[in-house]
Amino acid sequence: MAELWTSIGAAPAEKQEQPPKPRDVILVKSPALLSSTSSSDLHPLKKIRTDDKCLKPKRVNGEGGGGNSKGGPGHSSSVTWSFPQGASSSSSSLCLGNPGKTEKPTKPREKRDKEKKRRREGGGEENGEVKTAGIPCLPAASPVTAVRNEIKIKDKEKQKEKKKHKLMNEIKKENGEVKLLQKGTNEKPRPNAEDLQIKKVKKKKKKKHKEGEKRKHPKMHSKSIQTICSGLVSDAENNQFKEAKVEKDVYFMGLLGKTEVKKVKVEKEIPFVSLKEPRVEHKLKCLDSLEFKHLIHIEHQPNGGASLIHAYSSELSQLSPVEMERFSEEFVTLVFSENENCAAFYVMGIVHGAATYLPDFLDYFSFNFPNSPVKMEILGKKDIETTTISNFHAQVKRTYSHGTYRAGAMRQISLVGAVDEEVGDYFPEFLDMLETSPFLKRTLPWGTCSSLQLKSRKESDDGPIMWVRPGEQMIPVADMPKSPFKRKRTTNEIKNLQYLPRASEPREMLFEDRTRAHADHIGQGFERETTAAVGVLKAVHCVEWNENPRITKDVICFHAEDFLEVVQRLQLDLHEPPLSQCVQWVDDAKLNQLRREGIRYARIQLYDDDIYFIPRNVVHQFKTVSAVCSLAWHIRLKMYHPESAATQNSDNLEETESGKETKADIERRDKTLYSSSTYTCNVQFKDPKQKPPQIKHEQTYPLQTSEECGNINLPTISPAPTECHTFETKTDYTTDTPVKNEMESTLELINQDFADRHVTPKDTRQHILTNSVIRTEEENMC
């Protein structure tokens, strides 16, 4: 410390003799200066004086050299100082001891100096003192050059980065990772993710627009415009429907205002009923004209939008046999009724409990026809086994439990005789039992509503057929015969470690008892067309009987007016058999999708002892819920085939005309015999000795005389000579007037009798003319 204060005290004395000294500058050592610094430590440098013009003093912290200098920052005295190693501390203090004579720098320069201090790495600051040990005091660089150096360094760094990027791009190009864009007029920028999404949305809109153009008008689901927007009705008819709807609304508003219930008058004309609008039973005007409308229940399903008809045997039991016949006629005609587009109003008609009078089908056939061959499926396999119906019934009894049995299904057998590879036989007694029902009597393939006129029931190509299904169920693998789900043993230990028996090996299998969507058809090739179907359901009981009927089938039926759209959406192949027309199973998700597109459907549950009727163009799918034996057949209704009905009527007319012709031939033969008998009578008058009592005997029994004449074989006599004979006889025999009057009266009576009873108009006219001519000639001759 004493040395420090002595140096400070000696400083003013030296000021007068020596010129002002610049402050020491701490320089960042470059690798070239490191050697010089090491040599300077060994050999201390001496003070070197140079001219003012040679070197320019470097400013540090915005300050110049001595305090007496009045020039700019670049014109101060350029003097470099060096100190020995021992006097470093004193020199540093001396260099910092002249703050009073320095000029105040500007504010931006102070900011620059602060930034420079922060960037320095070589030197350190302790309590405001700069360490300069072992470092020579070289001239400091100006701030402008420092800024320029910094800019150059930044530029160099940027260039290095660019070079690195270029090298990386070249490497990627060589590896093929970067695709080169061809420069030219057709150069397009790469699309962004947003542009791609916009393009996808535009494509979807175009597709929807095209689908909308395929349909003439998009289907609307509003209650008020649903019928109009379907595109199936003309504008004139739409206006009529609007007017009818307005009248209906006014009518029902009036009914709501009245408290008394009045009877609705029966309408002569049945109005058009549109099922596209949700309606209730009492709103359907077509039911008002029916005699048994209180026994018909119409169900409109809000989810699917389609309607169906129900009738219950418990309510029909009160009817007499004659009334039952009339009710069956009304019910069948209502189920198969269609609009002007040939689309049925209802998707199905069901008579619940109408087959209770029939015996259990399996029991009946296994007891009465035990050796009848049938084809039986095997669970879990596609193989088919041929066995007898009694053996099949025994397997059903052995595996039956609570509505299902665990055996294969029985394939269809024909009940009207087997043809080619078919299985079945002709069972006339069973068919007679079916015909006892008034509903089935009308709707069998040869029924009263059918357009077919079969000579024998064996000629039917439309059924009936019978089959048995076990019901959809989950079956354990242990109960499956020769289970196909066996684990494949592998020698790989890694796979064995990943083996999870619960996940990889199924312990039970789903047995799907389903018939995919299809439509009933008749004919082949270009003559193939849709038709109606009728079915009878009898549940398999096997001694277990319940009071309430069991659900046997879950059915989905699509509206007949949406037939073409359903075929397009479900990709139906209508030329395939019913089991393979559709590839996919229509579940709830698919139904909701179809409903959003305007397609109507109905979900139906069929019970034991039900008889159901399905109109044409109704696509339907079945799922067997419990074990059931089914009967089904196709019916060609007269309303579906008006041409065949017309041909049948013409055939009937031809038969009646042929019958009339045979009768006319018989009458003509009788007439010829009668005419010959009259001529013989005239010829007999040639004899003048003939007695009148004989003529009176013929007059009293005219029919007997004609029969006697008909039985006698007389020679053929031409009319010309007989007329000559009559002339001669009547010219000779003119005196007997009473005999002449009696003959005229007998001829008139006989001619009137034949004209009224036996002879056709054409024939009678010819014979009447000849006889009248004879009579007139006789009168004139007299």
Curated annotation (Swiss-Prot):
Compositionally biased residues, Basic and acidic residues: 14-26, 101-113, 149-160, 167-177, 185-198, 657-669
Gene: rsbn1l
Bias kind Gly residues: ranges: 62-74
Assigned EC number: 1.14.11.-
InterPro entries: RSBN1/Dpy-21
Organism: Xenopus tropicalis
Binding residues for 2-oxoglutarate: T515, Y612
Cofactor dependency: Fe(2+)
Task of the protein: Lysine-specific demethylase that specifically demethylates methylated lysine residues of proteins.
Bound cofactor: record note: Binds 1 Fe(2+) ion per subunit.
Stated name of the protein: Lysine-specific demethylase RSBN1L
Biased composition (Low complexity): 30-42
Swiss-Prot/TrEMBL keywords: Dioxygenase, Iron, Metal-binding, Nucleus, Oxidoreductase
GO cellular component: nucleus
SS bonds (residue pairs): none
Main location: nucleus
